[in-house]
Amino acid sequence: VRITAGPFKHACDLNVKVLLQYDTDRLLAPFLREAGLPKKAETYGNWEKDGLDGHIGGHYLTALAIHYAATGNLECKKRMDYMVSEFARVQQANGDGSICGFPNSKKFAEEIRKGNVGIVWNYWVAWYNMHKTYAGLRDAWLYGKNEKAKKIFLKFCDWGVDVISNLDDRQM
């Protein structure tokens, strides 16, 4: 469905105007940091620096994909494709399929793999945070028609399954 006129088009245009004010490199900074890659910009403050680092990146990717699908806005597509490419670099640098922006995400996954599920209480909603990235990649694939996003998403899913594969029902 393409939105071409009326109040929904006006609302989409306002959304896109706001979306294009964000700096994608600032949104990607937590993911690059966790992958050991040099940041291209400093991360945003507040929640993006206080333990929930990276959660806006997934929301943003979803918004870009939806607005590209609904309006055909090429700047949304360009930014979506850029974020997907950067997530591919992060995933490759991590070497295990993960794409996480929250602090000490590798330690989190190691502890969960060992069955130490109590570690979740030391993190600010880690699974929620990762879900935003999962959803953003899924939306870039399904709505934005980005095939690279599909590959990255599925590899990230495989990583998530691997992290929890040894947990029993009680631990889940």
Tell me what each language-model feature is.
Residues 1-172:
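Glycan-recognition and catalytic cores of secretory/periplasmic carbohydrate-active enzymes
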